[in-house]
Amino acid sequence: MLWKLLLRSQSCRLCSFRKMRSPPKYRPFLACFTYTTDKQSSKENTRTVEKLYKCSVDIRKIRRLKGWVLLEDETYVEEIANILQELGADETAVASILERCPEAIVCSPTAVNTQRKLWQLVCKNEEELIKLIEQFPESFFTIKDQENQKLNVQFFQELGLKNVVISRLLTAAPNVFHNPVEKNKQMVRILQESYLDVGGSEANMKVWLLKLLSQNPFILLNSPTAIKETLEFLQEQGFTSFEILQLLSKLKGFLFQLCPRSIQNSISFSKNAFKCTDHDLKQLVLKCPALLYYSVPVLEERMQGLLREGISIAQIRETPMVLELTPQIVQYRIRKLNSSGYRIKDGHLANLNGSKKEFEANFGKIQAKKVRPLFNPVAPLNVEE
């Protein structure tokens, strides 16, 4: 999942917005800022500014984010606001949407209504739609390739993706929907063939594909050549078809985002760090595919973090999945385990490993053992009379 995008304020660039005489050498910055803002304001479309004020929009935010929209001759402030209100947005929500996505006011109402109908194909009702727009206004107001978007939505529905997943993809990976639908179909065929070629079954392939697309839709932006090169490289490294299938099942489409060079670098680093044979390394990778996925700098940082905590290479090799944890998470968990008297460097890393939920469950068991009484309080005592 995955798969959440923001714009940076560029207010300081206002001073260079248009050519003007240079201010005095020691002129205060604030004076320069005010001067250029006034100059920009004189070129703004006053009708646009007035209509935005009526919608309770903070014009200063728009000037900082995308002041160019205020210079446009043709804008549709009232029309866009009306469409949002028809969907159920109140005045505060409308103002927030326009402040965060100012380019909405230069979208034609006709195009926005078409976009509205398109998104309604995957939303249960208008209430759900307006919530999505409030959360991801930029994705909604990226008005282009609408016919492609519609065809791609229909294609994903035919594949079996649920509407709730498609709506999430529309907001998180809009570029996928701007792809020609034939390109997405080609990529899906390549993924299906790749799964079957390494021994996957037809029955499992559909489940795998749907999980892959819901967790990593950006795979569709890859090229078929890159996918084939990755699989061929793994085979050259001695991985059998069954082992590659295991990696595909665990890493989903993330495996296809790796290039042979990055895989080779990660393999070389792990082999050197663990001082192991090619066969042993393959077993480590199958236990922890992150050894392939993470870059060398990330693996090195995480391994050094574990070593600083007194954990040995032998312990890491026994439980390599611990490398999936960031150094910050490792430090927090070790401190928590130490507070219960559990010394991680003398024990097994399984208690350190796992998701947050799994760790808390293990920690609870350790605490329970610590406070457990040495005798059964309900058992009868053998007392001599």
Curated annotation (Swiss-Prot):
InterPro entries: MTERF, MTERF_sf. It comes from Homo sapiens. Belongs to the mTERF family. The keyword Lipid metabolism does not apply. Expressed in skeletal muscle, heart, liver and pancreas. GO terms for cellular component: mitochondrial matrix; mitochondrial nucleoid; mitochondrion. Residues 1-35 form a transit peptide. It is found in: Mitochondrion; Mitochondrion matrix, Mitochondrion nucleoid. This is Transcription termination factor 2, mitochondrial. Monomer. Binds mitochondrial DNA and plays a role in the regulation of transcription of mitochondrial mRNA and rRNA species. It holds the Pfam family mTERF. Keywords: Mitochondrion, Mitochondrion nucleoid, Transcription, Transcription regulation, Transit peptide. Its main location: mitochondrion. The gene is MTERF2. One of its GO terms (biological process) is termination of mitochondrial transcription. PANTHER family: TRANSCRIPTION TERMINATION FACTOR 2, MITOCHONDRIAL, TRANSCRIPTION TERMINATION FACTOR, MITOCHONDRIAL. Signal peptide: none annotated. GO terms for molecular function: DNA binding; double-stranded DNA binding; nucleic acid binding.
